[in-house]
Amino acid sequence: MKVRPSVKPICEKCKVIRRRGKVMIICENPKHKQRQG
């Protein structure tokens, strides 16, 4: 899980979701997991 000020989809399988007001990226590739800090 990467915590970044700006999250962007890295590949086509990355999905942008919102959980408890936080923007997150979920993907098949675990390296692509991000959340906005």
Curated annotation (Swiss-Prot):
Q: List the disulfide bonds.
A: none
Q: What is a single cellular component term in the Gene Ontology annotation?
A: cytoplasm
Which keywords fit this entry according to its UniProt record? Ribonucleoprotein, Ribosomal protein
An annotated GO BP: translation
Query: MF terms per GO, please?
Result: structural constituent of ribosome
The answer to keyword DNA-binding applying to this record is: no
Instruction: Tell whether Ribosomal protein is among the UniProt keywords.
Output: yes
Q: Which InterPro entries match?
A: Ribosomal_bL36, Ribosomal_bL36_sp
Q: Which family does it belong to?
A: Belongs to the bacterial ribosomal protein bL36 family.
Under HAMAP family, the record lists: Ribosomal_bL36
Q: Please report the name of this protein according to its UniProt entry.
A: Large ribosomal subunit protein bL36
